Regions:
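Conserved PLP-enzyme active-site core in the AAT-like
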Residues: 27
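A glycosyltransferase accessory/donor-loop signature
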Residues: 87, 92-207
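Short, P/G- and charge-enriched loop/turn segments at secondary-structure junctions
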Residues: 5-8, 74-80, 152-155
Length: 207
């Protein structure tokens, strides 16, 4: 509870550290996904993937090169200029994660006042700081971010395509809200829900 949190990022964001540590010595790699991600394609390439010895994780970048440069400067880590990633998708090399003591070092950094002053996305920024130059960058299809609020705009570019594997529903509106289920991009979630044991569970209503 001593770690930084905000209204948008509760202490649940740090569960990815616990998950990674739990699977050390149990499996060679583990796939972490945020709870607001839905799968609409095969993950067989991830299952078959073998990490080179010097890489800790596979990730997907967000933003463009100019954004990466800004994050590298503000976080004080030059390697981030090669790619700043969203921590909602992490394919983790468990042996390397353990060898690098990523979880322990991240938690230690999150207790340092000087680090806290720099960060805006607590777990994500710290992981970018720790893992720069130790990453494999995957195609955006493995973490395609989309806010349902985009659909309120007169025009927008939908990044979700038939090739998208993981749709990451960012923003405050989620497909499990009862006012958002019928958006086209929500249908992947609805199909999964209707095929699940929770098919008869009501969608969330406004508070």
């Amino acid at each position: 509870r001593s770690l930084p949190s905000t209204k948008n990022w509760t202490h649940a964001i740090y569960f990815r550290f616990v998950i990674a540590d739990y699977f050390i010595s149990k499996v060679a790699k583990v796939l972490y996904l945020d709870a607001d991600i839905i799968c609409q394609g095969t993950i067989e390439p991830l299952i078959k993937f073998s990490f080179p010895d010097d890489k800790v994780a596979m990730v997907v970048t967000e933003g463009q090169a100019d954004w990466w440069e800004k994050r590298a400067h503000s976080l004080g880590v030059a390697g981030i200029s090669k790619g700043y990633f969203n921590s909602g998708f992490l394919l983790i090399n468990t042996a390397k994660w353990a060898a690098q003591q990523v979880s322990a070092r991240a938690i230690a950094m999150l207790n340092e006042p000087e680090v806290i002053k720099k960060i805006t996305h607590p777990d994500q920024d710290v992981l970018n700081m720790l893992l720069a130059d130790k990453l494999i960058f995957a195609d955006i299809k493995y973490n395609t971010q989309f806010s349902l609020n985009y659909q309120l705009k007169e025009s927008f570019i939908n990044p979700v395509t038939n090739n998208t594997i993981f749709i990451h529903y960012i923003g405050p509106t989620k497909p499990w809200h009862d006012w958002a289920w019928d958006y086209p991009v929500s249908q992947a979630f609805m199909e999964a829900k209707n095929a699940s044991p929770w098919k008869n569970t009501a969608l969330l209503k406004p508070n």
